Each structure stands twice: as C-alpha cells, then as structure tokens.
Amino acid sequence: MSRLPSGGRIDRTHPLRFHFNRTPYDAYHGDTLASALLANDVRVVAQSVTYGRPRGVFSAGVEEPNALVHVGHETMLRATQVELVDGLDAVGLNGRGRLSAEPDTGRCDKVYAHCEVLVIGGGRAGITAALEASQSGDRVIVADEQAELGGRLLGAAWTDWLETSLAALRSRPDVRLLTRATAFGHYDQNLVLIAQRRAGGGRLWQVRAKRVVIATGAHERPLIFANNDHPGIMLAGAARTYINRYGVAPGKRAVIFTNNDSTDPVADDLKRAGLTVEAVIDVRSGEAVVDTIPSPLAGEGQGGGCLGAVVIAQLIGKGPRRELECDLLCVSGGFNPTLHLFSQAQGRLRYDEGLACFIPDVAPTNVDVVGAAAGDLGGRGQGSIMPYWVVPSDGREWSTHFVDLERDVTVADVRRAP
C-alpha cells in the first residue's frame, strides 16, 4: 500500500470498496479512481490506443491522457475525474474501446440563470474575484469542474485561506457555487453553457452574465524524451496533488526533471511524504533525462513496463551517461494557460517569449482573465524558465518520443507530417 498514514482531504472514517479489472481494492471517500489505484500500488491502468504500450496515471485532473477506463455503460472516462463510490466497478481501457448498445437511463435537465458576474474556475484567482464581486451585492455564480472548489490549492500543503474564503462566499445570499460543473461554450453577449455532473444524470446550465471572469488556471506541460510513457512518469504538480490532497505516495524513489522553478515545493513535499529524491535534473544546468528503462518486475500493476530507472546525460558534449534507479519521475516543462473559452469568445492571444506560452492579448467586451489563465504564473512558482521541448537521443530516433500520449503520436509522426 502507498497510502500515507495521515494527511490529505480524504475521509478516513468512511472506507469504500471497489473493483478494478475484477480485482477488489479498498479506498476512502474523497478518492478518485486514480488516487485509489495509486494507493493500492496499481501502476498499469490501461494500454495505449495504437501500440498497446502499458500506461499509468500521468496527471491529477481533466488533462489525463493515459488512465482511461470503462465504468458501467460509460467509456473513455478519465480515472482522475471518476469520483470513487462504494461498489464502483471499473475496467481499464485497452485500445479504442466500444460504445454501449444499451440506452442511457440517466435523466438530465436544464437551468436558465442570470447574474452580474460569472466566474469560471474555482481556484485562488477565481475565489478572489468572486469575493470582490460579491462585496457589492452583485449576483455571482462560480463554476468549477472539480468536486471541490480550490483548484491547485487542494494540492498544496496549506488550505487555511481557502477554507476561510469559501465560508465567506457561502454566507453571502447572492453567491451560487457550482461544483462538478464544466463550462464548455462561451457565446455572444456572454452566454455561457455549463455541463454539471450529478448522480442519476447531468444538468445543463445556460448562464447569461453581465461580466465573465475567466479563471481557468493553467495546465502543466510535460518534457519529451525517449520512452517518456512508462507508468511511473507523471507531471510534477500531479505528484504533489496526490500527496497533499489524497494522502498517497506515488512512488518510493523519485527523480525530478524540470526546466523551471515550480518543482522546488514538489521536492519538499516528496521528502516530507517519506520518498527519497534521488536527483533533480534541470535542463538549465545542462543535464537532461534522455531515456528511461523499464522495471524488470513482471505483472500488471506492480511492474509490466513500469519505470525502473532513468538515463541522464549532458545536453552539450559527449560526457558519460549515468543511470539512476527510481520508480517515479516527476516532469515539468512549464505551463500553458487554459484559454479555450477565451479564444471561443473571440479573444486574441499573443506568444510570450519569457513565459514560453500563449497568453491573452485583447479581451472581448465584459470579459476578464485573471490568475494563471492570464499568464500570472507566479502562483505556480514557475519563476525563470528555459524553453525546452524535445530531448534528442542517439541516432535521432524519434519513434518513442511521445508528443500525444492519448493517441500514441510521436515526434517521428510529427516530422513525417506534410
């Protein structure tokens, strides 16, 4: 078991029982399927769609490309988004999956709502915007895709400000907080469509807002190197989330591979959770992880292609390579602001060389972007960053450098594209 003896936001007084690939496991209320599998040392969750390579949990949120599962009649669900309930029965998705021929028995409804301010995103920036807007008595709606408001703060070691702020919002009668609510459409005159997940069926919110605040945060980017898809490789921020939010140690011996400063607190949290941090490999120091070696262990979950070691080399010159044994590789290549809704609303973007990402440039009328979505990545701790996208390997062989883990797209595929 990789469950930490204390910590996390899970309810340890409320144990749950679930099945994955016909094997029973134990978990707690507040777990996702992904966190519960990691807690039970299940590392291989599925196989890749084209090559059938073993894949494990890579992230902790909606951006998960690997851990795709079937639950009941629903397929292509991300284990990081599946909230665990007692008796849940899930199967890892191997290949492309198949839609169920059974009719959907869920009952869905729709709600029309109006407000002065709609805040999309319930992280620190979104909660701050909602607090400011609600002070004047405006009707405020906050929508967030997660089961809890808090965003990245849920994966941090401190949450005092979050609890105090949420209590203040809940005490204000004109504030409505929507969880499990994904904004997926931003149309003319600030009409926003929101899909809310509920037991027994979904709900479609059609919200007309005088002003929309986009506080959708940013997604962490990976770094691309040979065999960067082994189970045991995950985003650095995800490792921190599993420790602090779910009380799970995602490994025992960790290596961190980065090009920015956001991994400093990750290393601290890994050590505090009892993991050994074997090394921090920073491309700004002239080193990189150039390849990975699978574990010699066999068997689904415990081994079967899981990470066993990393190969480290100098970026310039031909110095000696070295191998480090590890079962967890935390990667961070910087952050991309989440600007899909901003672009759909006809907002204009520009590329920021210093941040190595696109950020908002010209916003539509009555639309504001705040926090990490606006390029304010100080809260992510990114600090200085050395843009670095692909680590070359000997002979420039690109067929195992995965760009799109979900669809098995490699650097070789991109180079062949017209």
Regions found by a protein language model. Give the residues of each.
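Residues forming the flavin
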Residues: M1-P418
